């Protein structure tokens, strides 16, 4: 197989679903992200390793990080996205792909939903769209999904979307405060049998 420099790989954007417009992060997203992090802090601090200190997520700090993320997107090192509700334009979900292996054509996906938009199916819709996009637009062979033990919301989405349970890595996830949690691993290798969803890019 001929190796292609990842920088030259086309990543068509945005991704559209019936309720979401999912796009790369852009200049000016920092304040909006800081607001969503503050709103959702209790849940993020429970599950996300990066949610260690609340005072670290200022609008300025988030804008700086946004611009680093934009550079990573151009270099194809990471794909961090924001999902906006199609009808209102409100940002409701932060999602994307990480641990991308372009040569092996595999990656992991993940997300978090701001508190005011939870329990409305946005995570399931976005995860479905991202899996379809990974296989259809990015040519991935494997899409992984992991979560910490006890994160039942993520487990239910993995099951609902037909991600195969691959096993448990004991104590592999580090949570805020240095706590360790078992990592539950799921994966898909194609979109066969996934719930129907209209996705365009």
Label every PLM stretch briefly.
Residues 25, 36, 54-62, 75:
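Generic, well-ordered alpha-helical segments
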């Amino acid at each position: 197989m001929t190796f292609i420099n990842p920088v030259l790989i086309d990543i068509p954007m945005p991704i559209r679903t019936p309720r979401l417009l999912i796009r790369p992060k852009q200049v000016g997203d920092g304040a909006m992200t800081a607001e969503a992090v503050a709103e959702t802090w209790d849940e993020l601090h429970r599950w996300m390793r990066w949610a260690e200190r609340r005072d670290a997520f200022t609008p300025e700090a988030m804008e700086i990080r946004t611009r680093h993320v934009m550079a990573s997107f151009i270099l194809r090192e990471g794909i961090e996205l924001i999902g906006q509700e199609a009808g209102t334009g409100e940002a409701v979900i932060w999602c994307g792909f990480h641990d991308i292996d372009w040569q092996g054509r595999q990656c992991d996906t993940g997300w978090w939903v701001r508190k005011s938009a939870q329990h409305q199916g946005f995570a399931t819709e976005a995860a479905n769209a991202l899996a379809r996009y990974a296989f259809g637009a990015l040519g991935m062979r494997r899409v992984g999904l992991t979560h910490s033990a006890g994160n039942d919301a993520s487990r239910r989405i993995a099951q609902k979307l037909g991600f195969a349970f691959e096993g448990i890595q004991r104590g592999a996830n580090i949570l805020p405060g240095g706590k360790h949690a078992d990592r539950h691993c799921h994966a898909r290798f194609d979109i066969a049998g996934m719930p129907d969803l209209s996705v365009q890019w």
